[in-house]
Swiss-Prot record:
Protein name (database record): Streptococcal surface protein B
Signal peptide positions on this chain: 1-37
Similarity field: Belongs to the antigen I/II family.
Highest taxon, organism lineage: Bacteria
Amino acid sequence: MQKREVFGFRKSKVAKTLCGAVLGAALIAIADQQVLADEVTETNSTANVAVTTTGNPATNLPEAQGEATEAASQSQAQAGSKDGALPVEVSADDLNKAVTDAKAAGVNVVQDQTSDKGTATTAAENAQKQAEIKSDYAKQAEEIKKTTEAYKKEVEAHQAETDKINAENKAAEDKYQEDLKAHQAEVEKINTANATAKAEYEAKLAQYQKDLAAVQKANEDSQLDYQNKLSAYQAELARVQKANAEAKEAYEKAVKENTAKNAALQAENEAIKQRNETAKANYDAAMKQYEADLAAIKKAKEDNDADYQAKLAAYQAELARVQKANADAKAAYEKAVEENTAKNTAIQAENEAIKQRNETAKATYEAAVKQYEADLAAVKQANATNEADYQAKLAAYQTELARVQKANADAKATYEKAVEDNKAKNAALQAENEEIKQRNAAAKTDYEAKLAKYEADLAKYKKDFAAYTAALAEAESKKKQDGYLSEPRSQSLNFKSEPNAIRTIDSSVHQYGQQELDALVKSWGISPTNPDRKKSTAYSYFNAINSNNTYAKLVLEKDKPVDVTYTGLKNSSFNGKKISKVVYTYTLKETGFNDGTKMTMFASSDPTVTAWYNDYFTSTNINVKVKFYDEEGQLMNLTGGLVNFSSLNRGNGSGAIDKDAIESVRNFNGRYIPISGSSIKIHENNSAYADSSNAEKSRGARWDTSEWDTTSSPNNWYGAIVGEITQSEISFNMASSKSGNIWFAFNSNINAIGVPTKPVAPTAPTQPMYETEKPLEPAPVVPTYENEPTPPVKTPDQPEPSKPEEPTYETEKPLEPAPVAPTYENEPTPPVKIPDQPEPSKPEEPTYETEKPLEPAPVAPTYENEPTPPVKTPDQPEPSKPEEPTYDPLPTPPLAPTPKQLPTPPVVPTVHFHYSSLLAQPQINKEIKNEDGVDIDRTLVAKQSIVKFELKTEALTAGRPKTTSFVLVDPLPTGYKFDLDATKAASTGFDTTYDEASHTVTFKATDETLATYNADLTKPVETLHPTVVGRVLNDGATYTNNFTLTVNDAYGIKSNVVRVTTPGKPNDPDNPNNNYIKPTKVNKNKEGLNIDGKEVLAGSTNYYELTWDLDQYKGDKSSKEAIQNGFYYVDDYPEEALDVRPDLVKVADEKGNQVSGVSVQQYDSLEAAPKKVQDLLKKANITVKGAFQLFSADNPEEFYKQYVSTGTSLVITDPMTVKSEFGKTGGKYENKAYQIDFGNGYATEVVVNNVPKITPKKDVTVSLDPTSENLDGQTVQLYQTFNYRLIGGLIPQNHSEELEDYSFVDDYDQAGDQYTGNYKTFSSLNLTMKDGSVIKAGTDLTSQTTAETDATNGIVTVRFKEDFLQKISLDSPFQAETYLQMRRIAIGTFENTYVNTVNKVAYASNTVRTTTPIPRTPDKPTPIPTPKPKDPDKPETPKEPKVPSPKVEDPSAPIPVSVGKELTTLPKTGTNDATYMPYLGLAALVGFLGLGLAKRKED
């Protein structure tokens, strides 16, 4: 800070921080203070805060707004406060001229004490007071002018008489002076002439003597020098002449030899040049001919190569064709010969075998017929006896079987119930054990963390304790030195600053408003207009405090205690134990003001700043009791803690009232510890104060107040004493006399030097007691079931002997004819390449001879010059000696005259004048705007919006002092991204700096701006205002801000607080609509039921419902630039599982009204999207996995007006169909969406569904028993009746859609199988219906199906009725199986696959394969008539298809065998009862409905 201007007023409590600024300019809103009665400490803060998140799934910028910086918190807590003021100079030109004229006229002018006009806080008040001062100045000037004029007349008369006498005296004096002047001139003339002559003579004599000595010395030196030079010259001359002669002789010899050598070399070089020219001419001619020949040969070679390559390509193509044709013909012929030979060999062998078989068959047949007739009669008798015995055993078996099955079922039911009960109990125990594990783990983790912290704290404690012990020892050794405690102590109390404390005062205590208290005090006679100077001055002191609205304004009544409670303390502790509350009890004990019953007091919002009170230049004594409480609300005993009683002034009172003001602490119930060298002493009643003035050296003080009474002074201990607490309740009186205003701060900031803080030993954590897990219940014992009785085994009937049939004799086959040999093509003749011409030989360039260089000419020698002979300098002549002159005598001087006495002058009058002092406090205002310049205070704007803070100051008043500095400091809110370049551009006229550590921007007016402000100080001047530019970055954040203006380091003021909020803040008291921005995504079926997490069948449609969450934007005032970032909704759908249905997309508002102006675009990937879309998603930090849809507002501004700013959320219905092929693999698919507002992304939850894999199965059985043998891959006899078992795919429980279709489609091979028209359909598992009823597994569901048969193509389709399927609960699984009865009608191997359709999606089963061999004695089949189709609800008993045995009475009747031939008739589908169900079957299906399966039908 610069040194502030001092205007000559006392250092009051209000003005201490200004080092003597004008009375009343008080710093009221104080930040971090020490426990001085009236000082302020500057505090630095940083913006480094822990990063946390908002809890909202924001895709970009998810961090929550950090805690406000300390600087910002303190600044806003002191909003509106003022520190100091600017002096206003009212023109006193007329008064000054009158004073100057009076002084010039000789009037005695006395300047009286300046009149204090107080502080103007408004422009109107300022103007009024300036007018009053001008009027006062004019009145004074007029009175001074009158006195001056009268005095001037008296002076004129006196001057006339004086002038007359002075003239006479002057005439006599002039004559004397004239004579004296002539005398002095003559004396001076003579003296000058004599002195000149003497000086000239002495100078000439001195110069003569000097010149004579110099000449004599020079002549001697010259003679010696000449002799030396002459000797040297003669020696050098002889040496040079000899050297030059030798050099000349050597040079002439070398020139002669060089000339001879160069003549021989030049002749030889001329011959070499001629030979080289001839060789080059020959080489150039040969090279030219070579190049021509080479070009011709290369052209011929290129033409020959091209022609050969063309012929070669044609030859190779033709050769390849001929070779392939011949090879194909040869291979075909050789194969035909081989096959023909093999066939004929086989036919010949077979024909030979046929002959042998025919002969053998005839002989065997004749013998068998005879034996058959004898065996038949015996078999029939044995079979009748066996049947009667079997029926009796069967009845007994069935009775016993029923009993055993019931007993076992009862035992099983009891056991299963016990198992379920046991599972339930153990599940509960396991859940409880899991919680115990988690609690134990949490306890362990917490203990380990506390233990680690304890160990770290212990190490720090030991280190701190060692430093503390050393500091205490040092304090002991220096206790008698100035500034140290006379009894060394350590500090265990930390009670220094609590700016965020919550102050409460009982409602029974009246808290005054500013104007209300002002009126009350004025009623007491304390008024600016009171002619009693003491009371008018007291008012200015009172008004300086009362104008600050951060204090609680109270009136204390004598002996009536008032409690002021502070809670929510954050920074205070005693011996490491946190202090959460402090209670001050104030009681007025006595006052010398008025009737002694009341006094004003002001309680600070910070308990460490404490309070101001008044004494109105009388005396006041207030008792203060202080109690501290811990976090449990228990009263704390702070015995041993130290408190600071400082800035206890004496002798610095108002010069206008009484300078001997005194501040003291009295009746302290603790113990004082004096500071060595301090002015504060202990007195009776345990009081402490200074015995004499500690304000001025001239009055005995060690220092002036300004040298010790500041927070930064190293001597501030001079006015302090330390109190040691000895009781739970601290009590003392704060007392004053003639002080006006008194600020008393109670805290632990000790002014003494070297008071260490005693470290607190950490407490070791207690190891937790872990819970023991509970044992599980033992499983119930499995019951022992009775074995079912063994069913009787019927002795098989003896088969009737087969009647032999006369064999059909085979016919021999003819041989195959031999194949014809092929005719082969001749291969083409290959082309012959013409040989290339050889290239000519290239001539070789000759090797040229090199001419020999000439010998260089010898260098001519450089001859040395002969030396110049020395010349002797002639001797100088000696000078002539001067003669001394003769001097003139001096004349006699004239006599001086006696002057007449002057008259007595008139008495000088005395006039008095005074100036008036006026202070001004210019007002400031902070405005907050968006990029469009719209005021957004107390409103909402979107995250990432540009927010501008305008720092405005009202016009500077006329009469102001020269503005030397004009500084605005703005501690920015956290989460506000400051743009330095934009701020500088918007803040012309200021030098802008930014401190990143404290997140503070400072504007200093430039020299040019200050020059504008100072151009005419007599007129008001409008100020420039800087603008802070930046962006708000956080969701759900509140950005509050104010700034501080400091002018000339003499006046400071903190502005109002502005506020703006971003959406996404739940429970926002300022914006009731504000809450998390949480778009949602829900999957629904077509009925609108939520199907998130459910099983979704392939082919089903997901009706995704996307909520565009906009309600928290209601009242938003974002700028046009922010709006142009647009509004979008992104659906990142799984394209591998779903197909979008853009034709079904709908957008509606919350009331269901359709919304226009929103478009949707689908992109296969991020890479396929336009660059603009890629940039949009990147900025919003959205990464899509593949294909995605982008919904966008066509006109962002209209969309903003209609939906965003009104807080109207939208609902997008976005249907998507599950791909059919996804059901064949099954699996999970996920879907996630994002909302993008103003460029900010917000994610929905992930919606997860699963598509079940439908795996139908096909078996071949001979009964309806599911456990019967599967004949897949085995043999089925010709004409055997069997079943194709079609097991449908499993539809899991908790599926999303009702079943509309569940069918079995079997495209059987009609060449080998014949459908009998009989089928049965059963439930494969328990089914739960919508009405709560249950259909048990194994229930016959045939009546709930319909069947269709396509006899021509061999297709049977069994469908469940839709009304039955829709009765099944969505929570129930579903699976069914159908048995199709078939009859094998042909020999061979037959494959079959069927298709299970679920909601129109087809799924192929496995393929079954059965083989029918040629029977040894096949029966002749009887064709089965085709029945008419029947309603399955009205079953009809069909005729049993018969497979007759050979008849005895017709032994010669042959039965033809059909090998792989289709029957000419096929029965139509019908429904049969269970009589013939063991023989149901279904033909194999391959390749139905485009499934790509290979169906083989043999004709």
